[in-house]
Amino acid sequence: MAITKQDIWRAADELDAEGIRPTLAAVRKKLGSGSFTTISDAMAEWKNRKTATLPSSDPLPVAVNEHLAELGNALWAIALAHANARFDEDRKQIEADKAAISQQLAEAIELADTFTRENDQLRERVNQLEPMERERDKLADQLAEVKRRSGEELNRCMEKLTQRDNEAIEARKQAKEAIERAASLQGQVEALKEQVANLTAVLKTGGKQ
């Protein structure tokens, strides 16, 4: 069954009687269903009718109006003083926050400047080290070349020493053989001398006879 305008008004009246503000959602919940557009149109008319049916109030006495005006002025002064005090507190807090932020910003800038200087110093050191590294690499290559040549020269010297050792051994062997031959020849010479002496003696003896 479609929900009628009277259903919506009745739900709104019941909510109002229960002390519940008849919002669109509250009325729809009370009804259990319904289009928000339909409920909105009906509630607009319900509010207009409710305003029109309110009894007009009698004008307040002048003394009451004056008292209310004084009370309103006093309340306004209190509210204004409170607002000014709150504004001062907020302004002081804002100034304090601003000072803190400025301090943090200054520290951040100082730290950034420090990092920048350190970075520049490191870059300069790197630039200074690059030629040194190239020179080191050059010296390392030269040292490797010297080691290679020294190794080759050492090998040649060792070969020469080995050759000389072999030659010395051969020379000692030949000298030993020469000494042995000389000793043999010396023996032969001594034997020949003895033979010559004997022959000489024999010849001398034969001549005397």
From Swiss-Prot:
Stored Pfam families: KfrA_N
Taxonomic superkingdom: Bacteria
Keywords assigned: Plasmid
InterPro entries reported for this sequence: KfrA_DNA-bd_N
Protein function: May influence the expression of the nuc gene.
Record-given protein name: Uncharacterized 23.2 kDa protein in nuc 5'region
Species this chain originates from: Shigella flexneri
